[in-house]
Amino acid sequence: LGKKVGETIHPVSLLHSTKISPNKLNDIPAEVFESFVLKKLEDGVRRFHVTPMFFGPTAAILEYMPQRVEVMRATWPDLEVRISPCVVDLDDPGDERMAQILIDQIHASREKCGFTSPSIALVDHGAPRIKVTEVRNHLGEQVRRLLPECEFPQVVACSMERRDGDEYAFNEPLLERVIGTEGFRNEIIVSMLFASPGRHAGPGGDVAKICEEAAESHPDLQWQMSELVAGHDGIIDILAHRFAEGPPSDPVS
């Protein structure tokens, strides 16, 4: 991304990544947003541009980050943070680049497994904000429109998990409830709306376990998880576009 936009890009997590041993990160310690910003503030930096590697407008970006900026601004009143749009912008419904990444990964999975007419379960983590699920559903609609129905008979957008309570029913259907339904009993490609591997999306992760458990109840089931989004070069083009959209935006207040 840095090469694409001609700037130095710092890979920074919002939370948690400092728990990972540097030994697993080529001996480069992970950094998280608040401590990174504070360190740069002490070095004299006052302006920051955040390009989110988030598919949709999560509470982390819309609520948590602005709250932390407000706290830091109490000590550093001239702190300025601008945030680019997320990877998928629902205000630009004609942008099919993210859907095309998913489609490329679907085709690669189909070729790898030799499937003839697989159904597609497009799965995300499952978020407590309906706007994030709207992104999932939007991508599902785009993928359905762009894939030939004669080769891919069904496309269903679903979530890996959801919170309890009717107020989170918008995350339905869950992946575990999709597998085994009509059209999802034989060849299935699980299209992974996940950026990178971890305890959910990695080998032996939660998504794989859901598929493995479903296969025990459906002996004809053949399934394959697609590669993850960060492994596709196209994500760099999208992030570069979002980066370019960042500077004109209003600073976080």
Labelled PLM ranges:
Residues L1-S253:
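Extended amphipathic ligand-handling, pore-lining, and cofactor/metal-binding catalytic surfaces
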